[in-house]
A protein has these predicted regions:
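Surface-exposed loop/turn segments and immediately adjacent short secondary-structure elements
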Residues: 1-48
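Short hydrophobic/aromatic beta-strand micro-patches
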Residues: 24, 74, 233-235
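Conserved polymerase palm-domain catalytic core
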Residues: 38-41, 45-59, 64, 96-268
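Core structural elements
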Residues: 53-59, 64, 166, 170-172, ...
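A conserved non-catalytic segment of reverse transcriptases
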Residues: 163-167, 171-172, 253-321, 334
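Short, solvent-exposed helix-loop connector elements
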Residues: 181-187, 296, 312-327, 338-350, ...
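Extended C-terminal regions of large enzymes
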Residues: 359-361, 366-408
Length: 422
């Protein structure tokens, strides 16, 4: 039942069978009988070893750079079985995972990874190997992943389940109709258990890094990893360190590094910066004019532009008939989630730009809601009118939160690489 509740709370789309969570719940004589029948039948399939996963439905979602990311959507039944397996396996592997790993783990977050980078920079680790793995989830070798799993899992039934999920056909809609392919490598993004499998595979990179003969010792380097995004930080990046990382990832793990996006950043040099998980790190002059002593970090320029584009889309002319209170409530919920994620470091200037942008967009929205020009009350300002309507002021929220360090912006925070920027 716990596995079902987790799947139901995510409200995912239907798989290839078209069955939704709502249809399962409402398929019986009352509100719960449909769910009970579904779970009993699924339990029988597993006990009698009749369970077979259905094909995964592939869809594509846009990425920030304009490209498309493939997303695999299993059926509700398969998601429930994966969630139940995850409940068993996650505590086992959590005992093995190292502190340098922060992504898709309980009690771990992107904020902790960012704080680790800040602490390493403050300790003098300013030369950073910023790596990019090309299509990581889709390129994990099945045999090597299964070998990693067999080191901790002895139950053949569980291993068989995972092997079946990895090799399940993927169905994709094309101009010629549905097309089915059987993957030879990778674990589909969108599967409930995929993030854990991805972490298990890269855990061996983490482990080798911190072995007694690894670069954590002979190069005095440090590793910060969030899923497949990671940086190697050192006081001095040597060719031997870079060569070790690339050989482990490509020759040993069979992954591919995107050379066009991988770079070495020396933050001690003027004009250099590190972008990680939507944040930007750079050194500026302090108030006395001393060069590169002040660590300035906060939302990156890319994150700022992405948020501006999102707010522009939310205030487009097609929403002119939406009641103003509902529109502002929607914008406020979005802003709260964005600010909750980008509250670290020194985001004041970026919050100020976001506040200016959302106010200018709302003014334009008010002016075009009617054929008659919108008239602001006499003696009032646009700033006051929008505040009276309830529009959130990001800079004001930020200043108030700094006065109360433990205070958080209320509301549902939703930001992404899910709690990681999208």
């Amino acid at each position: 039942m716990t596995a079902w509740n987790q799947v139901a709370s995510n409200r995912g789309a239907a798989g290839v069978d078209g069955v939704t969570i709502q249809q399962i719940v409402g398929s019986g004589d009352d509100e719960t009988s449909g769910l009970v029948d579904f779970l009993i039948e699924l339990q029988k399939e597993l006990q009698e070893k009749r369970y077979q996963p259905q094909p995964v439905r592939r869809v594509y979602i846009p990425k920030a750079d304009g490209k498309l990311r493939p997303l695999g959507i299993p059926t509700v039944k398969d998601r429930v079985v994966q969630a139940a397996t995850l409940l068993i396996l996650e505590p086992i592997f959590e005992a093995d995972f190292l502190d340098c790993s922060y992504g898709f783990r309980p009690e771990r977050s992107a904020h902790q990874a960012l704080e680790a980078i800040r602490a390493n920079l403050a300790a003098g680790y300013r030369e950073v190997y910023d790596a990019d793995l090309q299509g990581y989830f889709d390129s994990i070798p099945h045999d090597k992943l299964m070998a990693c799993l067999q080191m901790r899992i002895t139950d053949r039934t569980v291993l068989k389940l995972i092997r079946m999920w990895l090799e399940t056909p993927v169905i994709e809609e094309t101009d010629e109709g549905p097309k089915s392919t059987r993957p030879e490598q990778g674990t589909p993004q969108g599967g409930v258990i995929s993030p854990l499998l991805a972490n298990i595979y890269l855990h061996w990179f983490d482990k080798c890094f911190y072995f007694t003969d690894g670069p954590a010792h002979w190069a005095k380097a440090r590793l910060v990893r969030y899923a497949d995004d990671f940086v190697v930080m050192a006081r001095c990046q040597s060719p031997q360190l870079v060569d070790w990382v690339e050989k482990k990832l490509e020759d040993w793990l069979g992954l591919k590094i995107n050379r066009n996006k991988t770079r070495i950043v020396n933050l001690s040099k003027e004009g250099t910066q590190l972008d990680f998980l939507g944040y930007q790190f750079r050194y500026d002059r302090d108030r006395f004019g001393h060069a590169w002593r002040y660590l300035n970090w906060g939302p990156s320029a890319k994150s700022l532009n992405r948020e501006k584009a999102a707010l522009t889309a939310m205030t487009a002319s097609r929403f002119g008939l939406v009641p103003i209170d509902r529109l502002i409530a929607k914008i406020n919920r979005h802003l709260k989630g964005w600010m909750n994620y980008f509250c670290l470091g020194y985001p004041y200037d970026v919050f100020q730009k976001i506040g200016h942008h959302v106010r200018s967009r709302m003014i334009r929205h008010l002016l075009r809601r009617s054929q008659r020009p919108y008239r602001f009350p006499e003696g009032s300002t646009t700033y006051r009118v929008l505040a009276d309507l309830g529009l959130l002021n990001p800079t004001k929220v930020y200043v108030n939160s700094r006065r109360k360090p433990k205070a958080k912006v209320s509301g549902n925070a939703g930001c992404g690489k899910s709690a990681r920027p999208v």
